């Protein structure tokens, strides 16, 4: 082998690394770490509280209050918790510019996981909404139908995002996934609003008031998503078009 063709011992180019090794070498900006930290804090109660429930259903110690629905039919709630955790926590990585622009392979691999997780989260949520028995204090007709509509919409948005990326429509792919993510993060906003209500009023909201607060959380998430789409994604699309 010629000296010019030889590679130094113990070193290799980035192309020689396996996909997992390349993913571990990804370096994020400080603002991206801050964004991930914010998502972790924002999602803490529903995401990690849900994982505690999974451990309980798997035979672990009882920490959270007993949930009769989970004991009678644990599979849907376990699927919902695990898939929602992946979709909300790991899905946040997909919005990082360092991943999207500089590591497209990692973006695609994570994206496939997120697509499956999002669909499982929505489908299991639909199953629980329809088949679990809720008292009027926990779910009235309005909340029932909003959950059904948004669960179906989340699946439709994820499927549309997959179709869009297949046709190289990046804008449609990004907007659809952002809207689906806003729906999937509903539980986090609901937890924040619920805690704020308890601190302000001194008691938990129940009945139609609780339904209204939970619906408002989804409206707020989708409103933020639309603001981000119009302020960040669409201007970038116009800039690319004007450069052609």
Cite the ranges covered by each PLM segment.
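Alpha-helical membrane insertion/targeting regions
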Residues: 12, 18-244
């Amino acid at each position: 082998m010629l000296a010019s063709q030889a590679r130094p011992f113990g070193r290799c180019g980035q192309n020689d690394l396996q996909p997992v090794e390349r993913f571990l070498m990804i370096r994020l900006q400080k603002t991206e770490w801050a964004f991930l930290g914010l998502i972790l804090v924002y999602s803490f109660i529903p995401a990690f509280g849900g994982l505690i429930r999974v451990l309980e259903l798997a035979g672990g110690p009882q920490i959270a209050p007993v949930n009769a629905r989970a004991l009678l039919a644990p599979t849907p709630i376990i699927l919902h918790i695990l898939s929602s955790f992946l979709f909300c926590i790991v899905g946040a990585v997909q919005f990082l510019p360092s991943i999207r622009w500089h590591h497209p392979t990692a973006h695609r691999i994570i994206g496939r996981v997120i697509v499956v997780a999002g669909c499982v989260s929505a489908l299991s949520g639909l199953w629980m909404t329809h088949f679990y028995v809720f008292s009027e204090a926990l779910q009235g007709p309005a909340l029932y139908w909003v959950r059904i509509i948004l669960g179906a919409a989340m699946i439709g948005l994820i499927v549309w995002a997959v179709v869009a990326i297949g046709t190289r429509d990046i804008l449609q792919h990004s907007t659809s996934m952002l809207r689906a993510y806003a729906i999937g993060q509903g539980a986090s906003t609901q937890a924040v609003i619920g805690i704020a209500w308890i601190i302000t009023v001194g008691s938990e909201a129940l009945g139609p008031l609780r339904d209204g607060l939970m619906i408002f959380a989804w409206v707020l998430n989708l409103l933020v998503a639309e603001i981000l789409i119009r302020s960040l994604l669409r201007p970038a699309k116009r800039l690319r078009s004007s450069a052609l």
